[in-house]
Amino acid sequence: MEKTISAIATPQGAGGIGIIRISGDRALSVADAVFHAVSKAKLSELPGMRALYGTVVDRKGTVIDEAVALVFRAPHSYTAEDVVELQCHGGSAVLRRVLARTYEGGAAPAERGEFTKRAFLNGRLDLTQAAAVMDV
């Protein structure tokens, strides 16, 4: 897949934690542009299956929200691509701002079902599994 995509991965409504998922070749660089780890580590330098605590910032460096970033390296992710999940506060205003920041960082809006489509096209799911996910 050429484009890197992002979307809110949690249901809308009242929830304490919300997740923004980023997937594609540039997922780590998009996340590095918007997430600053307290440890100063770059997500792009981490091996997979790692988490860092930090903040999501706007272009000026102003904090939007605190977050935990989880890195899943290809092919060991749902989509078989590099994936970053930004877990922040679950309010809709915060999630919209964090999502908008990922777009500014270079991600494109994901179409409905696009993460599952990528998982299918990349061999992570068979047709029956993909159809079952889409039915949920």
Please describe what each predicted stretch is:
Residues 1-136:
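A glycine-rich (often HGG/GG-containing) alpha/beta subdomain
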